[in-house]
C-alpha cells in the first residue's frame, strides 16, 4: 500500500517543530541519525516521499546506528511491558505454545550470544513458527550477512510504523503527532512494505 497524495496526517508531521518531530520519529526508530535525516528533509509532498526518505536513511546507517536502532526493539516473544506497539507487532507469538515460546527464548539467547544484538525481524503478519524458523535459518549467517538482513528488516518495520503514524494522525487528530510528546505511535499490518526479491526470509505483510 502506497500513497502518492498528501494527507492531513502528513501535513501535521511536516508542520511539527524539530524537537517534536524527532520525538515522534524516535517512537518509530531509535536511531538518532535516521530521525535527524528524516526531520531535516521535511516537508514531504507525499507519504511515498516520506517512505523513500526512510529507505535512503536506513540504507546509510552505520554499524553503530544499526545497533542504536536495534536497542529500541525488544526480543521476539518478550514485548516491552505497557508498549502496545511491540505487543501488536509480535502478536504472532501471543498464542504460541509454551514449548514454542521456550524454544524461541533459547534461540534468541543463542543468536544474541553470536551476534551481540537482538534478533530483529519484521514480525507483523508472521506466526510464531515462522519467526522461529527465521531465527533458525539466520543464526548460521556471517555477521556481515546478518547485518544487511537486519537493515532490510528494520526498513520494513520503519515503513509500517511511518505508515501508521501518518494515517493514524489523519484518522485520530491529536493522538500520534501531538507536539512535545511524540505521540503514541501504534502499528499494525496496514503500512506499506517494500518488496525484497531474494530475501532469505519471505514476508507476508499486508
Question: PLM features: residue spans?
Answer:
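Aromatic-anchored, charged helix-turn/loop surface patch used as a conserved interaction hotspot
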Residues: 1-111, 156-174
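Intrinsically disordered, low-complexity proline-rich tandem-repeat tracts
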Residues: 173-176, 181-186, 192, 200-202
